[in-house]
């Protein structure tokens, strides 16, 4: 799903602010008050809520979690919903592979499965809680603020369960369509502060499936904010997770890759790193969609902390952190580094495990690689990137429907280019490496492999 993001306004009560004291039962006894109206942030620009010095996002989130209209743990239907998910998303083929050391032969196709692949616990948890919400509220209107995960199969299943996306008109989410008593699911990527405020104001039941690893990153940028450090966020500025993370930050800049990080660090050093940066005006034009409101590179790059979108390449995040640390040492001296740099480990374990398994897989003797996952999945794109860098023929597809008759395939490269190829499966016996993104059910991988087996069976019949 492609969404054009822009700064957008939504009419919301403006008397929200820092919390009153809590009762001994843990429920909110006061109201939240805020002096200034705010706008919902739908782009790289910061929201006025986040920029409001009177507003404490951490306090707001803490009190939201304690409110009676908020749930992030499910509704007591875990066993039942996991059984349903098991029937819909598991795979006999994947089970056979796991039972045989992640390698098995079907006809003239040998399949090698990565050691870590597919659904991570955070994704499984998010989907399970969403299923529980439908069970708990069978008649209520249920909305979701974004795709729950980046997988078309799972998102379609939720649509079939009458979980509806909040409509978007010209880049603006139509929150006014949500009525008191409706249920609203926050996806695994989380939701921005302004969206949470809007929903809280409308007195709806919030079901929060945000991955705890994402929440961990929010805690990190809140620490940066408290210490008056600018958060340098390694991520994609239009990605749902990064939008949410930035809403909890104070001052921030989002860098997509090492090249952009080098540009920022070169600017800090006055062009003495690699000469890639230029004027302040050029800097602001380059990052106009990826910085907080009022960002000034001459003022806000004196103290910096590192955070990341949890699905980015682990190694690149680490290298960016080291680069910024070295830059601050060069600029301000080793003895003063703690006054100018903070680093926290916000790399998701599941992302790291899948990337490590992929690095191991590409060292195996395989003829080609199948990377299965949603085409808008950031973590899946990086698995494809690892294979491409190794020079292995690799095909990133989101479902078996991308494999057509006559040995044709439509797939994406890691940077998003769509490619169509004929005769992609070599003749004769082949060894296929397989992995899948953290949002991909095993059943989707099974359907892909069945298509491959069918094509190779047709080939064998033609030879015979």
Swiss-Prot record:
<feature type="binding site">
    <location>
        <position position="150"/>
    </location>
    <ligand>
        <name>(2E)-4-hydroxy-3-methylbut-2-enyl diphosphate</name>
    </ligand>
</feature>
<keyword id="KW-0479">Metal-binding</keyword>
<comment type="pathway">
    <text>Isoprenoid biosynthesis; dimethylallyl diphosphate biosynthesis; dimethylallyl diphosphate from (2E)-4-hydroxy-3-methylbutenyl diphosphate: step 1/1.</text>
</comment>
<keyword id="KW-0411">Iron-sulfur</keyword>
<keyword id="KW-0004">4Fe-4S</keyword>
<dbReference type="GO" id="GO:0046872">
    <property type="term" value="F:metal ion binding"/>
</dbReference>
<feature type="transit peptide" description="Chloroplast">
    <location>
        <begin position="1"/>
        <end position="66"/>
    </location>
</feature>
<keyword id="KW-0560">Oxidoreductase</keyword>
<dbReference type="GO" id="GO:0050992">
    <property type="term" value="P:dimethylallyl diphosphate biosynthetic process"/>
</dbReference>
<feature type="binding site">
    <location>
        <begin position="377"/>
        <end position="379"/>
    </location>
    <ligand>
        <name>(2E)-4-hydroxy-3-methylbut-2-enyl diphosphate</name>
    </ligand>
</feature>
<dbReference type="GO" id="GO:0051745">
    <property type="term" value="F:4-hydroxy-3-methylbut-2-enyl diphosphate reductase activity"/>
</dbReference>
<comment type="function">
    <text>Enzyme of the plastid non-mevalonate pathway for isoprenoid biosynthesis that converts 1-hydroxy-2-methyl-2-(E)-butenyl 4-diphosphate into isopentenyl diphosphate (IPP) and dimethylallyl diphosphate (DMAPP). Is essential for chloroplast development.</text>
</comment>
<keyword id="KW-0934">Plastid</keyword>
<protein>
    <recommendedName>
        <fullName>4-hydroxy-3-methylbut-2-enyl diphosphate reductase, chloroplastic</fullName>
        <ecNumber>1.17.7.4</ecNumber>
    </recommendedName>
</protein>
<dbReference type="GO" id="GO:0051539">
    <property type="term" value="F:4 iron, 4 sulfur cluster binding"/>
</dbReference>
<feature type="binding site">
    <location>
        <position position="211"/>
    </location>
    <ligand>
        <name>[4Fe-4S] cluster</name>
    </ligand>
</feature>
<dbReference type="Pfam" id="PF02401">
    <property type="entry name" value="LYTB"/>
</dbReference>
<keyword id="KW-0150">Chloroplast</keyword>
<feature type="binding site">
    <location>
        <position position="239"/>
    </location>
    <ligand>
        <name>(2E)-4-hydroxy-3-methylbut-2-enyl diphosphate</name>
    </ligand>
</feature>
<feature type="active site" description="Proton donor">
    <location>
        <position position="241"/>
    </location>
</feature>
<dbReference type="InterPro" id="IPR003451">
    <property type="entry name" value="LytB/IspH"/>
</dbReference>
<feature type="binding site">
    <location>
        <position position="310"/>
    </location>
    <ligand>
        <name>(2E)-4-hydroxy-3-methylbut-2-enyl diphosphate</name>
    </ligand>
</feature>
<dbReference type="GO" id="GO:0019288">
    <property type="term" value="P:isopentenyl diphosphate biosynthetic process, methylerythritol 4-phosphate pathway"/>
</dbReference>
<comment type="subunit">
    <text>Homodimer.</text>
</comment>
<comment type="similarity">
    <text>Belongs to the IspH family.</text>
</comment>
<keyword id="KW-0809">Transit peptide</keyword>
<dbReference type="GO" id="GO:0009570">
    <property type="term" value="C:chloroplast stroma"/>
</dbReference>
<keyword id="KW-0408">Iron</keyword>
<comment type="pathway">
    <text>Isoprenoid biosynthesis; isopentenyl diphosphate biosynthesis via DXP pathway; isopentenyl diphosphate from 1-deoxy-D-xylulose 5-phosphate: step 6/6.</text>
</comment>
<feature type="binding site">
    <location>
        <position position="439"/>
    </location>
    <ligand>
        <name>(2E)-4-hydroxy-3-methylbut-2-enyl diphosphate</name>
    </ligand>
</feature>
<feature type="binding site">
    <location>
        <position position="348"/>
    </location>
    <ligand>
        <name>[4Fe-4S] cluster</name>
    </ligand>
</feature>
<feature type="binding site">
    <location>
        <position position="120"/>
    </location>
    <ligand>
        <name>[4Fe-4S] cluster</name>
    </ligand>
</feature>
């Amino acid at each position: 799903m492609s969404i054009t993001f822009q700064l957008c306004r939504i009419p919301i009560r403006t008397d929200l602010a820092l919390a009153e004291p809590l009762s001994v039962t843990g429920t909110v006894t006061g109201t939240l008050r805020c002096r200034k109206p705010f706008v919902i942030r739908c782009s790289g620009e910061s929201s006025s809520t986040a920029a409001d010095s009177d507003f404490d996002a951490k306090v707001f989130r803490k009190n939201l979690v304690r409110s009676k209209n908020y749930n992030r743990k499910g509704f007591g239907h875990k066993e039942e919903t996991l059984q349903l998910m098991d029937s819909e998303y598991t795979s006999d083929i994947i089970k056979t592979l796991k039972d045989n050391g992640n390698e098995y032969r079907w006809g003239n196709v040998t399949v090698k499965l990565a050691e870590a692949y597919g659904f991570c616990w955070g994704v499984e948890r998010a989907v399970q809680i969403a299923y529980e919400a439908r069970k708990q509220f069978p008649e209520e209107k249920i909305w979701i603020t974004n795709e729950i995960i980046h997988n078309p199969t799972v998102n379609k299943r939720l649509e079939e369960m009458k979980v509806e996306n909040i409509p978007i008109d010209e880049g603006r989410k139509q929150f006014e369509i949500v009525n008191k008593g409706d249920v609203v699911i926050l996806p695994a990527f989380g939701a921005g502060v302004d969206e949470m405020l809007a929903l809280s104001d409308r007195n709806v039941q919030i079901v929060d499936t945000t991955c705890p690893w994402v929440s961990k990153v929010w805690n990190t940028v809140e620490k940066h904010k408290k210490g008056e450090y600018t958060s340098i966020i390694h991520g994609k500025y239009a990605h749902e997770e990064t939008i949410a993370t930035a809403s909890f930050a104070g001052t921030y800049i989002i860098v997509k890759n090492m090249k952009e990080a080098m540009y920022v660090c070169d600017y800090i050093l006055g062009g003495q790193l690699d000469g890639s940066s230029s004027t302040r005006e050029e800097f602001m034009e380059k990052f106009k969609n990826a910085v907080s409101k009022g960002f000034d590179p001459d003022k806000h790059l004196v103290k910096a902390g590192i955070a990341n979108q949890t699905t980015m390449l682990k190694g690149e995040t680490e290298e960016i952190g080291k680069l910024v640390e070295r830059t601050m040492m060069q600029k301000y001296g080793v003895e003063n580094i703690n006054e100018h740099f903070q680093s926290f480990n916000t790399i998701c374990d599941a992302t790291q495990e899948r990337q490590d398994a992929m690095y191991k897989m590409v060292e195996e003797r395989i003829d080609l690689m199948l990377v299965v996952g949603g085409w808008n999945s950031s973590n899946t794109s990086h698995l494809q990137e690892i294979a491409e860098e190794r020079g292995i023929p690799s095909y990133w597809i989101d479902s078996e429907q991308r494999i057509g008759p006559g040995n044709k395939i439509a797939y994406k490269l890691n940077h998003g280019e769509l490619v169509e190829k004929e005769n992609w499966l070599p003749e004769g016996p082949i060894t296929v490496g397989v992995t899948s993104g953290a949002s991909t059910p095993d059943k989707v991988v099974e359907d892909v492999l069945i298509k491959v087996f069918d094509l190779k069976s047709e080939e064998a019949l033609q030879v015979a």
